[in-house]
């Protein structure tokens, strides 16, 4: 499975070359189940299209597309630097990365944003981004569940 190919379009939204390389490295640490499972086992928090096989992937791609369109609109996007926009897109690609835990469990782990954040920090030496950007990225992801 070439995990990066699933996100070719979304990676193109990222402007900085180093950020593109970093998101590719981080996509490669996502578990295989991320690309196969529904976004929700109950349908309670996600639309019907995301409750099928590959639903989590679909949910993620839709979230990224909506963010990209919002950030392209000057009324919203002008408030963010290009680097901040890159980090937002990256956070959305990764936000549910370990939704079922590590290793995979039957149900959603409430702390799944903390799990992916931990994996990002553990892979810091493989990334080109600085500590401040890594903290921002992890903070965005960690706040996903409130």
Task: List each model region and its residues.
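Short, amphipathic alpha-helical segments
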Residues: 57, 82, 107-114, 131, ...
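An active-site-proximal "capping" alpha-helix that borders the catalytic cofactor pocket
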Residues: 63-66, 109-127
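Histidine/acidic-rich helix-loop-helix segments that form or flank divalent-metal centers
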Residues: 78-79, 88, 128-146
